[in-house]
Design a protein with these regions (language model features):
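Active-site-proximal alpha-helical scaffold in enzymes
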Residues: 77-89, 123-124, 131, 138-170, ...
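Flexible, low-complexity linker/loop segments at domain and module junctions
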Residues: 1-8, 92-97, 265-269, 295-300, ...
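Glycine-/small-residue-rich "gating" segment that lines the acyl/pantetheine channel
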Residues: 37, 152, 156, 160, ...
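Conserved catalytic cysteine-centered active-site region
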Residues: 1-4, 36-79, 106-153, 162, ...
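Condensing-enzyme catalytic core mediating Claisen C-C bond formation in acyl metabolism
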Residues: 5-9, 32-37, 192-263, 272, ...
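Conserved small-residue
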Residues: 8-10, 28, 81, 102, ...
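ACP-dependent fatty acid/polyketide chain-elongation machinery
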Residues: 1-67, 88, 106, 217-229, ...
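Acyl-CoA/ACP chain-elongation machinery
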Residues: 162-184, 189-200, 233-247, 272-285, ...
Length: 755
């Protein structure tokens, strides 16, 4: 029996060919593209100056006065989000705020009104705040695959019961630095691009698109009109190269096959393919191989087109924009054309050249590929009627390997020793001198973040004692979690663009996308399973773990590697000490770390004779605002039986939210001793969340936990309510772990001892 049907009931889009779905579709059908010369004088330094731009007037006419101070990225996203909610006819009475989720795809860190980089999740926080959404909130950053990836993760949130309605989409503006990077790679066409024929380069674009997802039965009950069904989705990793796609098409083909398997369909069911179609020689040649590999002899009879020929490459928005086009194709029975197609090109495939085609369309596969080797495929179908379905499976999941890399040491043995001795390493960067965790030809060209993440991944794999044949690695998942990606690469690239935009540091550019480090891990370890990257600040690791559990429960993988890594943007003074939760020892200190956690089904771990640290009993996440932190902690814990936890590893950083957290936790978990890893490592952003998960698992198995040395005047409770000595006097049956991205997401994970 199939899983619960999830449908799309609302669409929103703003891009170079339309300020809403109606105008967007009319332009697609008329063959009227929106790629034009860039109207910003700053871009005159480039030889290739064509892009898909959104007129400023289109933005201004759809915004309220209260939105005028928002940055351009947030404005684009808010316009498309409101359109999708409006078309779905969704009101505040139709969904509880706590059950209304958001999954947003972005490729680039975007500037605020003052030109400073914002946290990646900031755009999603703005959209959620303006629309009153307090449910699960995820920022996915798998570069140019992010928009499609977001739709798949949104479906998961509905199937697991975490949300009743989820808004999924993508957004990215046209940025000078990104343009310089693609120009430096010589990937831009000097005129409007011609995917699948001339293939002489791509055009960049900008825009936003959203799709509103909800269960079919719920949509019909409230009188909504289903526009399409999200029948399935597939993710994969190329494990091949930082920027170039695997020329064999293996990764892209794997994503399509996984999407169809998820949907319970065969290749014969596919009517039309919405291709990635960037117009670069490498991409277009690879996609042709994907078509032939997936569809075999039928490939020439499966119409495939690229709407990037209309709008340019909208990066993180591309998958969502193309998903909107796919839904409209299903509705109208029309395949959008590939415009600019040179009909003299020799090809056996049907790329719907230049003119839209009326045809029966029951199922669309929408494909996207990205730097870092991320691939995603969506299987969208004409919605069916209500039918019986199976509940989301409940497979037990365990943590079986830990790989910490921080100033405290490298590997679980060194971390355990540092905790037992009470050592502090605030501000101390991990040292990997003299150690190589990848082939030297790769290792010497890697930035520090990738080296840390790869080292952590290898160590977790070794700690788990897992040995799999090469073929099995195709089904091992990888979820990378980071707040900011590589500071080293971003800084180096920005500096090079400032000196000469025509000579950017292209090696740094390939590592500016936040999923690049996850791609490097996949390439080094040979992992080609379902892969994604989560960028929700300090809450990223718990969200990544949540996604890993969902993959395993759904049967999409038996083993998933969760890797979190961040490096400090500033350096803490030598000898800096902080004591979280103490009134007199406040102050935040940055740190750098990477932590890998190997997660697998309990059955798989037992069959191979593995020794797990802990069971994952449950997770919870709640969207929040800075003025709502206490209530958000309560909401993140609402579905977890955490009151009996013997240990609580909090998100405390020594900052202004420690008092709120301590007060609520001591109230809700009165018998749990409170601690955090941050006092010993500094605030390592996403890696601190993963470190907290690691020390909780270590406490359950080995009975040690970070002691809060120097704690004398806690914000809440008595000192006896906190961990004061690393060797715990009682065995820990359950441990609660908190993560927090202030003003964005609060997360909670409950771990339990192995039976």
């Amino acid at each position: 029996m199939a899983s619960r049907p999830v449908v799309i009931t609302g669409l929103g889009v703003i891009c170079a060919i339309g300020r809403d779905p109606t105008e967007f579709w009319l332009r697609l059908m008329s063959g009227q593209g929106g790629v034009t010369p860039v109207d910003d004088e700053a871009f005159a330094v480039f030889t290739a100056r064509y892009a898909g731009q959104v007129p400023a007037g289109w933005i201004a006419e759809q915004l309220a006065d209260a939105d005028a101070d928002l940055d351009r990225t947030a404005q684009l996203a808010l316009i498309a989000a409101r359109q999708a909610v409006g078309q779905a006819g969704l009101s505040a009475d139709d969904v509880e705020a706590d059950r209304f989720g958001l999954v947003l795809g972005k490729c680039q860190a975007t500037p605020d009104a003052a030109g400073r980089y914002q946290p990646m999740h900031r755009t999603g926080d703005v959209v959620a705040g303006r629309l009153g959404m307090r449910g699960p909130r995820i920022l996915v950053s798998t570069a140019c695959a992010a928009g499609g990836n977001a739709v798949g993760l949104a479906k998961d949130k509905i199937l697991t019961g975490e949300a009743d309605v989820v808004l999924a989409g993508g957004v990215d503006p046209l940025l000078f630095g990104t343009y310089a990077g693609f120009a430096g790679l010589q990937a831009l066409s000097t005129g409007p691009c011609a995917p699948y024929s001339r293939s002489d380069g791509l055009n960049l674009g900008e825009g936003a698109a959203f799709l509103l997802l909800e269960p079919l039965d719920r949509a019909l009950a409230r009188g909504a009109t289903p526009l399409a069904e999200v029948a399935g989705y597939g993710l994969s990793a190329d494990a091949y190269h930082a920027t170039a796609p695997d020329p064999t098409g293996r990764g892209g083909a794997s994503a399509v096959r996984r999407a169809l398997a998820d949907a319970g369909m065969s290749t014969d069911d596919v009517s039309y393919v919405s291709g990635h179609g960037t117009g670069t020689p490498a991409n277009d040649a690879m996609e042709a191989k994907v078509m032939r590999a997936v569809f075999g002899d039928r490939a020439p009879r499966v119409p495939t087109s690229s709407i990037k020929s209309f709008v340019g490459h909208t990066l993180g928005a591309a998958g969502a924009v193309e998903a909107v086009a796919s839904v409209l194709a299903l509705q109208h029975g029309m395949a959008p054309p590939t415009i600019g197609f040179d009909t003299d090109s020799v090809t056996d495939l049907d790329f719907v050249p230049n003119v839209a085609r009326r045809m029966p369309i029951e199922t669309v596969v929408s494909n996207n590929y990205a730097f870092g080797g991320n691939n995603v495929a969506l299987a969208l179908t004409v919605p069916g009627g209500e039918r019986e379905y199976e509940e989301f499976p409940d497979r037990p999941v365990v943590i079986s390997g830990l790989g910490p890399v921080s100033g405290l040491g490298t590997g679980i043995a060194e971390l355990a020793e540092a905790i037992a001795e009470g050592r502090q390493a605030v501000g101390r960067s991990p040292s990997l001198e003299g150690r190589t965790f990848a082939p030297r030809s790769l290792w010497r060209h890697m930035n520090h973040l990738s080296r840390m993440a790869i080292a952590a991944s290898r160590l977790a794999w070794e700690d788990a004692g897992i040995k799999l044949p090469r073929a099995a690695l195709d089904n091992v998942g990888l979820i990378f979690a980071t707040a900011a990606g590589s500071v080293e690469s971003t800084g180096g690239f920005d500096e090079s663009v400032a000196v000469d935009p025509n000579k950017p540091a292209v090696l740094s550019f390939s590592n500016v996308v936040l999923n690049a480090t996850g791609g490097a891990v996949c390439q080094t370890l040979g992992l080609r399973g379902p892969t994604t990257t989560i960028c929700n600040g300090e809450a990223s690791a718990s969200i990544a773990l949540d996604c890993a559990v969902e993959m395993i429960r759904a049967g999409k993988a038996d083993v998933v590697l969760v890797v979190a890594a961040d490096e400090a943007t500033a350096t803490a003074a030598a000898g800096t000490t902080i004591t979280p939760y103490d009134r007199d020892r406040t102050g935040e200190a940055p740190g750098s770390a990477a932590v890998a956690i190997l997660v697998e089904s309990a059955e798989h771990c037992a069959e191979r004779g593995g020794r797990a640290y802990a069971r994952i009993l449950g997770t919870g996440h709640a969207g929040t605002a800075e003025q709502d932190e206490r209530e958000s902690i309560r909401r993140s814990l609402a579905g977890l039986p955490a009151e009996g936890a013997g240990l609580v590893v909090g998100a405390g950083t020594g900052g202004r939210y420690d008092a709120d957290e301590a007060s609520v936790l001591l109230e809700l978990v009165p018998d749990g001793l409170l601690t955090t890893s941050v006092g010993q490592t500094g605030d390592c952003q996403a890696a601190s969340g993963a470190m907290n998960l690691a020390v909780a698992a270590l406490a359950i198995r080995d009975g040690i936990a970070p002691a809060l040395h120097g704690l004398e005047r806690p914000y809440a409770g008595e000192v006896e309510s906190y961990v004061r000595k690393p060797h715990l006097s009682e065995a820990v049956g359950q441990a609660l772990v908190l993560t927090a991205a202030a003003g964005s997401v609060r997360g909670a994970v409950l771990l339990g001892a192995m039976a």
